[in-house]
């Protein structure tokens, strides 16, 4: 499909720079399978679900992936900003760096340059390899949990570029940019639909008879990237690692067999479930990378309802929601949201989409 079909104009003032407080006070645009639109708030989510429905959340935890350091060992020591994007093993990470032109394979970057050191000492990394788009492989001198601790002490929350370009990360973001379900470290972006949940909402869902299930998909930085090709078929999707346990797969299969609906909280949960589903819709255990790219025409196998935020134009995520609810419906829903003052992107409001069977 033509990529420009997924374009739209968004006023800069519609981009949320802070989350709603409390979290479940965010607005929620309900989009029924018929295309009908309803303006609601997240705390009303239980009213739109049924006893026996199964809610699936992503329990990935965002790491402090934004690091600042200096190149050492040469005549000059330029400042280097690095964003960790994918763990390769116990000591090696793929990262995006700026300015990339200042680094060559073999260079050493020392993080925590402004007098900041972690409790375990300074954090050094060698540039092991360099790609054409500014991505590099960093081989750190520390390993495993010790490296994780050093990154946590020296790093900052990796806010999306549309927020970071307007303000610097602060102490509030350390909590705000983490869901209440966060347990398994590895994401460099939050599964933002999960940011809307509170203990009160969780209790209300349980009282409604909706069961809660956890999966893990470590969200990568590629989630923010627009599709730059003119045709969606030419786009290369980024891969992210995810895990669906046998216990959770069995529970979700049982819920569906009893006429319950699978409600994915976030596109990350949906992409993992669709990756783990067979043609008959049954879920199997999954622990692997997924690069599933969902565009209109895709036949959904595992998910019946999707709760998600409002996404960027020309993004793979707007293409996904257009596949789920229909492109015409989502264009109309987004136009309504913009006109009605909904807040967009990671810290913004939510949509609740009921799958269009056609």
UniProtKB/Swiss-Prot annotation:
Compartments it resides in: Cytoplasm
Recorded superkingdom: Bacteria
Pfam family, one: Queuosine_synth
InterPro entries: QueA, QueA_dom1, QueA_dom2, QueA_sf
Catalytic activity, as annotated: 7-aminomethyl-7-carbaguanosine(34) in tRNA + S-adenosyl-L-methionine = epoxyqueuosine(34) in tRNA + adenine + L-methionine + 2 H(+)
UniProt enzyme class: transferase
Any single GO CC term annotated in Swiss-Prot or TrEMBL for this entry: cytoplasm
Keyword Transferase annotated: yes
GO biological process: queuosine biosynthetic process; tRNA wobble guanine modification
Repeat is among the record's keywords: no
EC code(s) of this entry: 2.4.99.17
Gene Ontology terms, MF aspect: S-adenosylmethionine:tRNA ribosyltransferase-isomerase activity
Pathway: tRNA modification; tRNA-queuosine biosynthesis
Sorted UniProt keywords: Cytoplasm, Queuosine biosynthesis, S-adenosyl-L-methionine, Transferase
UniProt family annotation: Belongs to the QueA family.
Stated role: Transfers and isomerizes the ribose moiety from AdoMet to the 7-aminomethyl group of 7-deazaguanine (preQ1-tRNA) to give epoxyqueuosine (oQ-tRNA).
Matches recorded under PANTHER family: S-ADENOSYLMETHIONINE:TRNA RIBOSYLTRANSFERASE-ISOMERASE (PTHR30307:SF0)
Assembly and interaction partners: Monomer.
HAMAP family in the cross-refs: QueA
Protein name (record): S-adenosylmethionine:tRNA ribosyltransferase-isomerase
Species of provenance: Rhodopseudomonas palustris (strain BisA53)
Organism classification: Bacteria, Pseudomonadati, Pseudomonadota, Alphaproteobacteria, Hyphomicrobiales
